[in-house]
């Protein structure tokens, strides 16, 4: 309705904005570069910020710009996550049927990540978006 009135070519501010149309100010570009550095060196990072500052947008940008020949990004955004479901969701993204035993599923995930790196040279990058909503059990 308002798109026609303002002569917009698409609805603004949707989550489906193509990556090439995202506004990337220098601050977000720097964060993206730092996250790529973390992925290159197999490090752990925590990205925090106020609501609406672009955290999820940066993760979308990262998922689209990481070289797929070198990286496989696994993404989870589930505030009701349990350790067993965490491993199951990641293994599903790798195309592996997960054990319902949390300890076995954890080993499966570690093995799959090691195989991907050793055989294919692909680093697995795990992203848990909205992790501030996770339970204490999940954070352990």
Question: Where does each model-flagged region fall?
Answer:
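A short, basic N-terminal segment
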Residues: 1-41
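Mid-core helix/loop region of P-loop NTP-binding domains shared across ATPases and GTPases
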Residues: 3-4, 82-85, 97-140
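Conserved NTP-binding/hydrolysis module of P-loop NTPases
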Residues: 8-11, 71-73, 81-100
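Well-ordered alpha-helical segments embedded in enzymatic catalytic cores
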Residues: 30-34, 58, 108, 112
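Walker A/P-loop nucleotide-binding motif
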Residues: 41-61
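Short glycine-/polar-rich loops that comprise or flank the Walker A/P-loop
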Residues: 42-43, 68-72, 122-123, 140
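Residues at the beta-strand->loop junction immediately N-terminal to the Walker
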Residues: 48, 77, 128
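Walker A/P-loop
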Residues: 56-72
